[in-house]
Amino acid sequence: MYPLRSKVTTVGRQASGARALWRATGSKESDFGKPIVAIANSFTQFVPGHVHLKNVGDIVADAVREAGGVPKEFNTIAVDDGIAMGHSGMLYSLPSREIISDSIEYMVNAHTADALVCISNCDKITPGMLNAALRLNIPTIFVSGGPMEAGKAVVVDGVAHAPTDLITAITASASDAVSDEGLTRVEESACPTCGSCSGMFTANSMNCLTEALGLALPGNGTTLATHSARRDLFEQAGRTIVDLCRRYYGEEDDAVLPRSIATKEAFSNAMALDMAMGGSTNTILHTLAAAQEGEVDFTLEDINEISYRVPCLSKVAPNGTYHIEDVHRAGGIPAILGELRRAGHLNLKVHTALYDNAEEWLDDWDIRGGKATEAALELFHAAPGGVRTTEPFSQSNRWDELDTDAANGCIHDAERAFSSDGGLVVLRGNLAPNGAIVKAAGVEEELWTFTGPARVVESQEEAVSIILKKEVQPGDVIVIRYEGPAGGPGMQEMLHPTSFLKGSGLGKACALITDGRFSGGTSGLSIGHISPEAAHGGLIGLVENGDPITINIRERQLTLDVDEEVLERRRATEEQREKPWTPKERNRPVTKALRAYANMATSADRGAVRVVDGYVN
């Protein structure tokens, strides 16, 4: 039997002071000696994906208590990337991932909690909590707030928008063809309920990947925030974490620990899922970071190999017209994993927090496999309510029938894949010797090869300005540099430039490349994560207006077509500047908090994690 971590604060004479304080929080004599379960909630009124989580911690806590544990809840910060988008607020988004990880480590270790329930949902919160779970390596279960319902169809200025979402609204705002009145109609329809934004954007992608890793319950990635079935997941999470405590502390079963579950094979499966569902490019950034926290040897090269062999089986917004509620109706994450299993693209030598082996897990939950349980069939019938609300669990609508059409439905089988390659592709070349990422699932195939002159800017704001001023020409390659993890700092998302390009009618006529990153809502020929970034001496820092740039997704190449001698002269000139490898003209205040992140941040090929040197243990 392993001793409870919390024993140091609950047992013996020396723990008397700590016990006195525990009693002041509501703990009783009978609680001492039971596992203390930390519930990391992320409720905030700033974020629709988290606005409904205020009382959810109580649901989990009640289940923990009934199962024999002692629940103690605390909160993390949560940044809404959509509200922070397009202005200096976006500088704080990616660094907030590290703050979330650190804050959970601080709370759990300072109070010697025995286990952890992560109530996450949106863009940086799930990755931040995942990093913390792998860092702490105590029994952990994830349960997210759930996705938002898709917006209702609207007809604006004679053009149908069906169904709507956040990206519909942002794109419409840049279109001269949409009136102010029409824009308001789109805006009012786009985000109708609480929950993470309704497409296969970063938040939903990461919640789906956490399910595939085995650290979340089946259905976690796709069950709507508004549906009563989501409440069942929270209750089950509370019961499950106490059982994991029993197995680990009582039976010395190390298999239930996060690092035993999230192995290299599990990371490979999660990334295979990502390729199959065309997830956000941010998932690569966060997966690389999580692997490092868990000391798993999983790199960009592994992701590149998976991308070559795993087909794209689904095109969900922004890559198509389906939304997460449609993925759920088609069987959710187990259905996609089931298709990969049948095609031989899944490693079955893994287990989950609930199941000892992958075969049993997928047999029970893959509705297309022929062995699914009644619980699985019931769960995936959960449908949207179609009513504007910020209340969770507020409806119990059901689909009349499930979508099991592997040829024309939301999830295809491997024989009828959208493409033989994965939805995310790693590019290399002299512009990105350490890699760059493109969401191939969101790029029209006629744009997979593209050559054009560079139009260089040194901030997202400048990019937005030249697009809205119509200074960008068809065929241009917009280069946004010094927006990487260190150069930004904070590696801003470029959703506004890509959305405004689309809204201006240039979405299929231009390319955009950056050492920054993109929102999960981005589609089109948008290449991010260029490594090394400009601030670290990357070649993107030497590009000049008019330089020809060639993109070849099929050949996985990103090339600056300029003679090496010319580039060496430019590099020598850059090195002689008073402040080399910094923007020449950019007025951007950088706070102490952001400087701290910038001084430790690695480039995107390493997950933009911090490297802390100089500490001697």
UniProtKB/Swiss-Prot annotation:
Q: Which cofactor does it need?
A: [2Fe-2S] cluster; Mg(2+)
Is Ion transport tagged as a keyword? no
Give the enzyme class.
lyase
Molecular function terms from GO: 2 iron, 2 sulfur cluster binding; dihydroxy-acid dehydratase activity; magnesium ion binding
**GO cellular component annotations of the record:** cytosol
Checking PROSITE patterns in the record gives: ILVD_EDD_1 (PS00886), ILVD_EDD_2 (PS00887)
Q: Where does Mg(2+) bind?
A: D81, D123, K124, E493
Give the active-site positions: S519
Q: Which NCBIfam families match?
A: ilvD, PRK12448.1
- PANTHER family according to UniProt: D-XYLONATE DEHYDRATASE, D-XYLONATE DEHYDRATASE YAGF-RELATED
- What does the similarity note say? Belongs to the IlvD/Edd family.
User: What HAMAP family does the annotation carry?
Assistant: IlvD
What name does this protein carry? Dihydroxy-acid dehydratase
